[in-house]
Amino acid sequence: MSKYICLKKNSIILGITASLVIGFFTVLQVVLDLQNIYGLFAALGCFVVALHQVSIRNHSIKFRLYAGVLFIFCMSIAISLGSYYSHDLITSSLILLGFSFLIGYTAKSDLVFANGILFIADMYVIGTGFNADVTDSILIGLFTLIGALAFIIVLVVILKKISIKNAFDDNYRSIRILPDIDSTIYAISLSLGLIIGNFISIYFDIEIGYWIPMTVLLIFKPDVIRSSTAIKHRLIGTVIGSLFAIPLAIYLSNAYIIWMILFITTFFTICCIIKHYGSYVFFLTIFIAMLLKLAHLSGYEISLSRLIYTVIGIVIVATIIILSKNIRTILKRI
């Protein structure tokens, strides 16, 4: 069990905090029977900032607060921009190109910095799945901000009441931007994958098509071994998770039972990402299906589409990895 889930004090606190805050926003969705998806974005903001906090869970409360707030504002802006430029293929591709090189050149940096950039880019990609005008884009970013800030506030309150020893020195940071050959090839390869995925999503006007570039973003690592592991875990976790998520999405109609499942899967999703990517994806698949079900979206159709788009994203990454190996060989001969 310890191979798949982390149940140390810091992890449990993050999992419980995320469950409480996401539970609060989603219970409002249930009780008030809201017909909009703004509550979903508040829950999403909470969830993503919780994932970011995983990488800084052993730092001081002060550092986690400052780093968390900075990250929150950046990711809220990113999701707003993604929503606004979601149908603008050229602008969206240029922004993804910029993110690709930021991710590529900071991949060898400190996890706080590298993961922060990665999750901000992830929020931009998620935003592209919700086409909106200026007003709605701002509202999407605002509710994301509210949900994330609520998480940080609750987390800080809990941490101040519980004594936890800091394992890391806050003064030590390894923020490096390395435009070497390996990082450049990785950035170019990642940008190619993201742009292809984004093109497929926008050109064919696919509902939740953003899942294709998002899959590329999350499984494409700087080296083949890590990418292969991420591909395997992503595929297996999504397939097994879908076997549970799809029947739940079809047959469950009681909003309160759906909410309870969402509450539980939130906790396990946060605790699993620390230990095992595959188990994280398994619980994430169920989490997403239940979250969308509460937002009056088709959890079944989206879960099935998500499985298909995950496979497409994996095929894109695998193809580019094979091609980039040949490019790397040619460049090293020059």
Regions found by a protein language model. Give the residues of each.
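Alpha-helical transmembrane segments and their membrane-interface boundaries
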Residues: 1-283, 291-334
